[in-house]
A protein has these predicted regions:
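Short, structured segments at the rim of ligand-binding sites
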Residues: 1-351
């Protein structure tokens, strides 16, 4: 077996061009396709989720294999349900065929969608026959994946009666729902919260427009981690293409890492303008980190590793959705951290 030895540099002084936001890219692509426009959004992410959506939308094969891309599976399920006159089978990897999709399928069926399972009930593959859906009032649990909710919202403007989506119980990942609504409005939709638990989407078609995707705050988290671990005031990392006031849920990384000593400085704070962000280590760290990741669960892994290496005790909550990703991320964290000598304990699969 080949072994590699990785050594940290003596000094960090780098400018990094981050990848485009996967979350915004995937939403913008679906909305662009629903607008039936010809101007593809600019600066799209090159991640697997985005690539399989681009391929499916461009080639339109009868059987669409979205591989291990969970976002693509959920967004394309809704999208194909409103493509009048088209029929497709939506499938993926073996792991994807064991990831539940029944909540979304049931909700779409309530709106009139023609979707059937070709294998095990409640799981992909799906056979979807697109048609004009009526819309109206729909209730779903607020604690389901925000991708299910976003998938339903994005087709709202195409429904004859629009969509009134009522979320029952505790609402998790609200920033991702807000990101979807914001992206929809960028393309002309009338969609917003009408009460704490209800979202109203008017039956107003999307309009085509040029659109530039800002860079990814999730990708920024690893550079924040490097600065936090560097323990040197002279170290500096510059990240290009980020926005102050970003709607990305993972933009909370700047606040959380401030608790671990990383200072964030924006070149400009003009709204809607991507700019360069400078990171420095102040060497001031909280003695213990407590945080609820319910609104940004994908950041949890970065902070588990970072806190462990910094010897900062931590207690993280809001991690229930990590169990049903492309792998069980909580078990993977426990397994890999154990190899480094750290013992993690999870409670109720959510903290």
């Amino acid at each position: 077996m080949t072994q590699y030895e990785i050594k940290a540099p003596q000094l960090l002084n780098q400018t990094i061009k981050l990848p485009a936001s996967k979350s915004i890219s995937n939403r913008a692509l679906i909305i662009h396709a629903l607008s039936e426009g010809s101007i593809l959004p600019d600066n799209l992410s090159d991640c697997d989720d985005t690539e399989v959506i681009i391929d499916a939308l461009h080639n339109k094969p009868y059987e669409m294999n979205i591989k291990a891309a969970g976002t693509a599976m959920r967004f394309m399920t809704s999208f194909l349900s409103v493509k009048k006159g088209e029929e497709h089978v939506l499938t993926g990897t073996e792991r994807m065929k064991h990831r539940p999709i029944g909540v979304l399928v049931d909700a779409l069926r309530q709106l009139g969608a023609d979707i059937s399972y070709t294998g095990e009930e409640g799981f992909p593959p799906l056979r979807i026959k697109g048609q004009q859906l009526k819309g109206g009032l729909l209730e779903v649990p607020g604690n389901i994946s925000s991708q299910y909710i976003s998938a339903l919202l994005m087709i709202g403007p195409t429904l004859s009666d629009g969509l009134t989506l009522r979320l029952t119980g505790k609402i998790i990942s609200r920033p991702y729902i807000d990101l979807t609504l914001w992206t929809m409005r960028e393309f002309g939709a009338e969609a917003d919260w009408s009460s704490y638990e209800t979202i109203t989407v008017q039956p107003k078609p999307y309009r085509e427009r040029t659109y530039y995707i800002e860079n990814d705050w999730s990708a920024a988290s690893y550079w924040y981690e490097m600065v936090a671990l560097s323990k040197n005031r002279d170290n500096v990392v510059r990240l290009e293409g980020l926005m102050d006031g970003s709607k990305q849920g993972d933009s909370s990384v700047r606040y959380i890492f401030s608790l671990l000593g990383v200072k964030t400085t924006f070149e400009t704070t003009e709204e809607g303008v991507p700019t360069t962000v400078t990171l420095r280590n102040t060497l001031h760290t909280v003695p213990r980190l407590e945080y609820d990741f319910v609104n940004s669960p994908d950041l949890a892994q970065t902070f588990v590793v970072c806190c462990a290496l910094m010897n900062v005790p931590f207690h993280f909550r809001g991690l229930s959705t990590l169990k049903i990703k492309e792998t069980d991320r909580i078990e993977a964290l426990k397994c890999e951290m154990r190899k480094l000598g750290y013992v993690l304990r999870d409670v109720n699969d959510s903290e």
